[in-house]
Amino acid sequence: MDVGFTRSAVQTLSRSHCKNIKQKISQWEGRANGVTKTAKFHPKDFGVRYNCHQESPPHKRPTGEERNGALPRNTDVKSRDQSEDEGEGGECRGSHPSEAGLDSSLVCARVKQIEGCQAVAVGPEASLPPGNFYTSQIPWRSIDGLSPDKPLNLALAPCNSTGREPDLSVLDSSYGITKSLENIYYEPEGQECGPSINPLPKPRRTFRYLSESDGIPYKERNCDQKYCESISCVDPSLASSQDPEPKKYGGKIRGRSKRKSFEFEDIQHFRNSRKIHEELGRNAGSALYYTQSEDNIYEDIIYPAKENPYEDIPVQSFPVWRSPSAWRLPPAKSAFRTPKLPPKPQFFQRKTMELKNSQAYFRSKITKDTTLPVTLTEWKLFRAGEVANKKKRNLPPLVLKINDTFESKRGKKRVKLQPYTGKEAPSSKGETSGNESDAEYLPKNRHKRLAQLQPSSKRNPHYQTLERDLIELQEQQLFELFVVVSLQKKPAGYTPQVIQQFPSKGDHGYKQSKDTEERLKVIPRFCFPDSEDSAPTLELKSETFSFVLTGEDGSRWFGYCKKLLPEGRGKRLPEVYCMVSRLGCFNLFSKILDEVEKRREMSPALVYPFMRSVMEAPFPAPGRTITVKSYLPGAGDESIELCRPLDSRLEHVDFECLFKCLSVRHLIRVCASLLLERRVIFVANSLSTLSKCGHAVVATLYPFTWQHTYIPVLPVSMIDIVCSPTPFFIGILSCSLPHLQDLPIEEVLIVDLCADRFLQEVSDEDEILPPKLQAALVQILEDRDEVLAQEQQFSQEVTLSSLVSEAFVRFFVELVGHYSLNMTVTERGERVFQREPFRKSHTSRSVRHFLDLFMETQMFAGFVQDRELRQSGVKGLFEVRALQYLETIPESEPSGVNRILRSLGSKMKFLHKK
């Protein structure tokens, strides 16, 4: 009786794609017609019993070379034809591991032992041949010197055998499973044909396929030996009992070429992949490519048709001892979908309303956007959105009161919309158009002052604005330089000199720029502006003041000084501690100077560590607090908190000192002179009074910035600067007044802060500002005490600084708050300011004539240029109030014809009454 498979069985199994390894290997054994004739009569067994009654004559004893046969590293596998019409089916012609020639007596004993097992019918899962097919080459090298009578024991040793029966329990939980050392499925060359024998069972596989859902569950390490033995003897009828339809791909049976091994499935099923599936998507399926054909376990896995854009990227298999991580697994085919573009980053989305002509855009965005529209068309859409989503804003009561005051003083005259024709209309300086009943008048010397301002309107191209200064400061350090200045006696008198400096020139990593060296030469003179009148004294009241150094490029350095009398006995000369910084924050640096004074009284050596800790501190943002730690003898480690106010515009401003020195009407006249960039000189007896009043007046110009010479305290030795024909704002001590009277000075406004009077004036300061707006501003400032008393009952946050700031901001909103309606956008995306439509949009002639003068100043040019160059909206206090002001402007104004008809109607009513 032939124990091999018949030709018909071979053809049947060649078309069968079994769902388990037993059928798979049985099919492969039956098709092997490329093996020798003797191999056909060998029962190819993977632990499956085909014919237990066949006698097995002894084999020839193999040679030592055959006995030491080893598995080759690479297996050459040929692909079979995919057609079903081929007779024998594709065979494996690759080199199989050579048989090692076991002793026939030992083999026969083992065969009889296996034949004694009863045939047990088990399910598909139990009939799986055990063991995977990966092993190390190391055990093969260790059997060279062993006697030929122990090969069976060696074969069973990796399975923890105790003698007769192989113990396969260890295979259930091990990673690397050792294969039998002798391959019995290959006939060595020259071996005689003989009766077939039953070979040793292969180790049981330690994994299940994903398609086998009804198999026996995975057993633990301590499974009993009977269960393991029952797997080794299986009814051969099960090999062909299940013949499912062959799996096809693309209408053809899949070939065997270019297929990867089952290593993917080993890893995928042995490691719990549920967590990976959840990460890659519930419906993503398996992330590893596994076989869809089960013809041969030694075939390479072929990939299905690639349906993703990454088809050229090969998938690398993972070693058996490594578990693939979720983020390295390739996504499944179902996971690939049409990619969606990411959302547009916020910094690419224009927050202003440029080039936006969709009314729906404004209706959806206007409630969140506090920037200003930039064109007239956009403003109309902006208004439509506001009407659709009209909500009453919760303005502070102080702001509402200020707005009511201006509206009551201004009357019905508001800004009207001027259509843009595409050409800049010539400026008509002497126009008298407007409401004939307007009681406003034109000052006599307006045209004369305009002629004087025009030649000097573009003297400095380096425009500076407050917003730009604040942005540049964010990348600076807290201060640039700290010096201690003292007076040194010389034959001509006392001369100020620097006696201590930090950082010093010798400090490592400190490189002093040329600009710093030039400014360092003049700093001592600003620290002691009255050095000629100084003398040793027993007592001196310390005072704090500041000065400003303006560079050729328009940059400014603030000097914060503290003048005091050093410790000692007898008459002593005063000293000045000076900190130079780009940040304008008077209160913050005053606190630092107080700490310096405390340490210098103990020892001058304590100043350096403290100043170094301050310089290394981060630059504080508005409203933020930084902590500086330092050591103080007797007190230990100290922490000093330095805080910047939230409103950075007013952090170096003291309006109380200003109102103590000047009345409201004098203050308005000084501000009007500065708006037209005239020359102004403050005179006072105290250094602190000069610096505080000077900073306060400059702060009232917001949102504009003084662009010219600004020296809060001018040294006597530099008094010649007042002869300059350019605009300036300078403060001098009263002791320098005699020197000032001897100098040839052009038109200048000299203000005595101590006496609250004008020493010299142009005599037209009251006629500069529009009278109605000026009256509203004066009323608010004069009633400041009453307003503050009422507002502080409801909110403690209302201060004098906030009241003065809001009043002046409202004044400028009435004048130029509609500037954004006259910004046009060119084809290149550049903003261009339309000057003439901007000026003509005011219905008041006094406002238009003031704008004739003010629009020629460098302050206004810097303001416009800053708005033209900015790509994002400016969100300062002025912009917020201007937006609220634009909401109150009516959408349409009566045309010129309507005004004529309305005036005729009023005249007819007047005649009818007569």
Swiss-Prot record:
InterPro entries for this protein: cDENN_dom, dDENN_dom, DENN_C, DENN_domain_containing_2, Tripartite_DENN, uDENN_dom
Gene3D superfamilies per UniProt: 3.30.450.200, 3.40.50.11500
Boundaries of every dDENN domain copy: 784-874
Alphabetical list of Pfam families matching this protein: dDENN, DENN, uDENN
Modified residues (Phosphoserine): S261
Residues of the uDENN domain: 480-627
Recorded GO MF terms: guanyl-nucleotide exchange factor activity
Record keywords, A-Z: Guanine-nucleotide releasing factor, Phosphoprotein
Comp. bias regions, Basic and acidic residues: 56-68
Entry-linked PROSITE patterns: DENN
Residues of the cDENN domain: 649-782
Location of the region described as Disordered in the Swiss-Prot/TrEMBL record: 46-98, 411-446
Function per UniProt: Guanine nucleotide exchange factor (GEF) which may activate RAB9A and RAB9B. Promotes the exchange of GDP to GTP, converting inactive GDP-bound Rab proteins into their active GTP-bound form.
Protein's UniProt name: DENN domain-containing protein 2C
Organism field: Mus musculus
Gene that specifies this protein: Dennd2c
